[in-house]
Amino acid sequence: MSRRALLLLPLALAGCTVLPDRPNIPVRRFTLNPERPTRRTAPRGAAVLLIRRVRGVPGLQELGLRRAEADGGFAIAPWDEWLAPPSDLAEAALRSWLQASGLFSAVVAPGSRAEHTLVLEAQLTVLDYAPAANEARAGLAGVLLLERSLSSRVLLTFDVRGRAPLAAGADAPAAAAAMQAALGDAFAELERAFVAGLAGASAAR
């Protein structure tokens, strides 16, 4: 074998290496779609609600499930993810929840041609699970606006939190289910705030 061939042999062998750069661990993806337990029909003349895009605060744009550590930090799961950005999933779930609440004749998204008088602007502020506390947590903050002609005014500001129990040693599917339940708890709290806020607005007219 020539000296040139000997020099090229290690390069050829390296090119045949097929070992992966990282372990071949399948990614698990989870839904985030808490549903209202019952569905109510809105009364005649109920308002139309527009929900603007729900955004996540910094740290909640990751797809990976978020675990709160005992030291106050957070860890993002590398192989366990939401199906889509959690704020997008929360927005779709919130629209369905509020439509089922019976408070509004319709709950629409930006781009809808439906005439609306109420606008919801919200952020997803919390979505994690805390093994040390045996709970999952979710939170939303924002404002409910009344829009008429070219003016608008704030009917309600809110910062709601939801919690759900989490068993010790829970795996990723159980943690995702607990976070979904916590988000549903936050939605229920928001619905109660809407009932009070809309009643106050009607009384003030």
Q: Which role fits each region the language model picked out?
A:
Residues 16-86, 198-205:
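A structural "domain/chain start" motif
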Residues 87, 91, 95, 101, ...:
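Extracytoplasmic/secreted envelope proteins and their assembly/folding machinery
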Residues 102-107, 192-205:
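Surface-exposed helix-capping loop/turn segments at secondary-structure junctions
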Residues 17-31, 35-40, 101-151:
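Surface-exposed short loop/turn segments
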Residues 75-81, 150-192:
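Short secondary-structure boundary motifs at beta->alpha junctions and helix caps
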Residues 3-7:
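N-terminal export leaders
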Residues 48-53, 66, 119-124, 139-145, ...:
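Soluble periplasmic/extracytoplasmic beta-strand elements of cell-envelope proteins
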